[in-house]
Regions:
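Catalytic-domain carbohydrate-binding cleft regions of carbohydrate-active enzymes
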Residues: 1-176
Length: 176
C-alpha cells in the first residue's frame, strides 16, 4: 500500500492528525514515516518526549487504523548525546588519525558510530529495540548510511575493520 512521508513530521499530534485525515477521507495508507530529528539529540535513538509525549498511545492508535509506523534512524552521535561518552570509551565510534573527531556538523557536532564493529552494531540495535521495536515499530529507515561526512577526508577516518580508504564502502551494508 501507500507509504506517507514528508520532510518531516515534527510532533505526535501533527502525525496523528495526518493519519486520521487519510482515514476520514477513505484514502489508502499502509505506512507513515517519522523522519529525522524526532530524537532529543542524534545518537539518543529514542523519541523526544517534548514533541512525542506518548509514543505507545500513538503506535496503538496507528495500529488500530491499520497503519504501520516507520522511524528514521541515523548513525550519528552528538557529543552531547546520553550515549556519546559510553560509546567513545568502548570504541564504538569512528576514529580519526588527526584533527577533531567531528565528522558531521548538522544540528550538532557528531561522530558516526562504527558499523564495522559488531559490538557497536549490537549496542545501537539494543537502543533501537528498546525505544522503537519493543513498542511495536517494526519498519526502519536507516538513513545517512553512506555515511555522509562534512569533510570527505577519507584517509583520516578509521574503523574497527581498518582505514576508511580500504573498508569504507562496506559501511552501508554493515549499518543495515
Amino acid at each position: 500500500g501507500f507509504w506517507q512521508c514528508k520532510l518531516r513530521y515534527q510532533t505526535q499530534d501533527e502525525l496523528l492528525n495526518v493519519a486520521r485525515e487519510y482515514k476520514k477521507r477513505g484514502l489508502p495508507i499502509s505506512v507513515i514515516v517519522i523522519d529525522y530529528f524526532h530524537w532529543p539529540l542524534q545518537g539518543d535513538w529514542k523519541f523526544d518526549e517534548k514533541y512525542w509525549p506518548d509514543p505507545d498511545a500513538m503506535i496503538q492508535e496507528l495500529k488500530e487504523m491499520g497503519i504501520e509506523l516507520m522511524v528514521s534512524i541515523w548513525p550519528t552521535v552528538d557529543y552531547r548525546s546520553e550515549n556519546f561518552q559510553e560509546m567513545k570509551e568502548k570504541g564504538y565510534l569512528i576514529r580519526t588519525d588527526r584533527g577533531f573527531r567531528i565528522v558531521m556538523d548538522f544540528q550538532g557536532n557528531t561522530v558516526h558510530y562504527d558499523a564495522t564493529n559488531p559490538a557497536a552494531r549490537e549496542y545501537v540495535w539494543q537502543k533501537a529495540k528498546k525505544n522503537y521495536y519493543d513498542k511495536g515499530i517494526k519498519v526502519f529507515w536507516l538513513d545517512e548510511a553512506e555515511p555522509e561526512y562534512s569533510v570527505y577526508d577519507f584517509d583520516n577516518y578509521r574503523y574497527h575493520m581498518g582505514p576508511n580508504v580500504q573498508v569504507g564502502n562496506i559501511y552501508p551494508a554493515l549499518y543495515a
